[in-house]
C-alpha cells in the first residue's frame, strides 16, 4: 500500500522528479438538480495539472489550504459541465453532488478532447486528494502517485530513484520483490494511458492493482 509518507519522501528526496501528486479516485454518479451522469472524481494536488497537461480555463484551481481543510471544492471538465448544465448555465460557484458529498465548482478545465485510446479527457472531476480520501473513500492510504521526470532522458534514473525510495520506505529486503508497480509513460501508452502527449514521462507508482484510468 502506498502511504502519504511515500509521497512525502519522494518530494523531499527525489532529485529526478519535477512534479509529484498523490492520486485517489472514485467512480459514481454526479448530480445537479434533475441532471445526473456517471463520471470519475480524482483526488489530486496542483502538480497533477502539470503532469497531465491540464489547465484551468475558467475560474481557479484549488489551493494548499483547500487540501489541508479537505474542502468540498472541485474543478470540472467540459463534458461534466455539458451533462449537468444542459441549459448553458455558468457552472462556476454552483454546487453539484458526487454520491452524497456536495462540491462547489470553482473552476472549469480547458478542454482536451479525446485521447488516442478514445477516452474522453474532459469527463472528470478534480478535487483535493484529502477530500476524496476522507469524504468519499474513507481511506488514509493512496491508490497511486503520479510523477514526472525532470526530462525524458532522465526517466530511467527517475524510475530507479523512485524504486529505491519506495523499497526503503516499505522496508523491503534485498532480493525480495517490490510490493508496488512503477509504470512509465511508454508502458502506459500501450496499456491504459489517458494522455496524448507521450513525450511527458509519467511515472505512476501504483499499489497493488493499477488504478490508472
Model-identified regions with their sequence ranges:
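Structural beta->alpha junctions
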Residues: 1, 15, 30-37, 108-114, ...
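Short aromatic/basic micro-patch
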Residues: 1-4, 43, 74-75, 126, ...
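Mid-to-C-terminal secondary-structure elements
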Residues: 47-62, 66, 71-175
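Hydrophobic, regular-secondary-structure patches
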Residues: 1-40, 44-50, 83, 133-134, ...
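Hydrophobic alpha-helical segments typical of transmembrane helices
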Residues: 6-9, 80, 128-131, 141, ...
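Glycine-rich active-site/cofactor-binding loop and its immediate structural neighborhood
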Residues: 212
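Peri-transmembrane interface segments
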Residues: 146, 154, 159-162, 173-209
